Amino acid sequence: MSSQKSSHHKADSKMEQDNNRKAWISQPSGLNFVWGGDSRYWVIPKEPRMPAELKMVSWLEVTGSFDKIEPGKTYRIGFKISFKPDATGWDKAPVFMSAKIGKKGKTVWKRIKSVSQNFGILKGGSEPVNIPDESDGLFEILVSPTALNQDTKLQFGLYEVWTGRWKTGLLIHEAFVQEV
């Protein structure tokens, strides 16, 4: 039996409640990173409040889940990101977010244009920003009022898997879920 290490990073912690922001927060260690188990591609911090650093990938897939949702309520989802000054590959990258309720739920997609449109400013060393931003519009998902006794885990993600171009320098500080 092989004890080979996975190429991917699997979430190892739950979301924490932030009462000031009225949100649930997932630190990078609480997210799943495709290629996150290989330090050539990602550096996933063990320390709290430190961002995950993208070294280099052509397939960006960062996912998380949240199970404290209630039927009939709406939830806003986002990520807090920044870029290293030497980040590359994001100026024409079609970044998307997705969300669905339960394994069999319908996936909702949203293009996050602010990443490519503001890439020059963002990689200039700005403070971390929330995506989607105001120019993208909010990303919200409604949990069906009839979802009682069904799989109601909110699954969400951040993706750029379409161009095949190498991307570097993304810092993911957290993901967040807020009841609206």
From Swiss-Prot:
GO terms for molecular function: carbohydrate binding. It comes from the Eukaryota. Residues 1-21 are annotated as: Disordered. Residues 9-21 have a biased composition (Basic and acidic residues). Pfam families: PP2 (PF14299). PANTHER family: F-BOX DOMAIN-CONTAINING PROTEIN, PROTEIN PHLOEM PROTEIN 2-LIKE A9. This is Protein PHLOEM PROTEIN 2-LIKE A9. It comes from Arabidopsis thaliana (Mouse-ear cress). The lineage of its organism: Eukaryota, Viridiplantae, Streptophyta, Embryophyta, Tracheophyta. The gene is PP2A9.
